[in-house]
Amino acid sequence: APLLGKEALVAVRTKILPCAHVVTPNIMEAEILSERSIRSMEDVKDAALRIHELGPTAVLIKGGHLTGQDAIDVLYDGQSFTELKSVRLDSQNTHGTGCTLSAAIAASLAKGHTLVSACHLAKSYVTEAIRNGFSIGQGYGALHHLWASGTFPDSIKPLS
């Protein structure tokens, strides 16, 4: 079942997106927002154009759900496209990647980085958080947000 009903989706398109600086939909979300299917990089770029027309300053479509040896995200800033590539990691420890990416972009922008630089930094950070992620509970495992510190707090260590 879709997370948002039709009325809520209309509100996202007409009220929220026009106020957004950067939106970061995954492939499935981008298909809904752009009202088109996405199967290729050209489709991703067309979807980014369509979403951009709804009002956000920039659109970063996350390519983690596409196939291929690389995970390629596409940033469109209203003028040009930038592809952000990383090696596709074979990991189930991906819970929270979208929220973490958005937060890392916002933090990098707040620190004064350009949009392109902020997106590159955020993608690198999330890639390493996935690479260093851990299985906890059932289902998708967690990212290791503190990977750069080299520490793993006892409070979040798996019990097994």
Q: What label would you give each PLM region?
A:
Residues 64-66, 87-90, 123-126:
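Glycine-rich beta-alpha junction loops
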Residues 76, 102, 106-110, 123, ...:
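Regular secondary-structure segments
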Residues 116-160:
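Charged C-terminal helix
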Residues 32, 91-115:
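Short, small-residue alpha-helix embedded
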Residues 81-95:
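Short pre-catalytic strand/loop immediately N-terminal to key active-site residues, enriched for Gly-Thr
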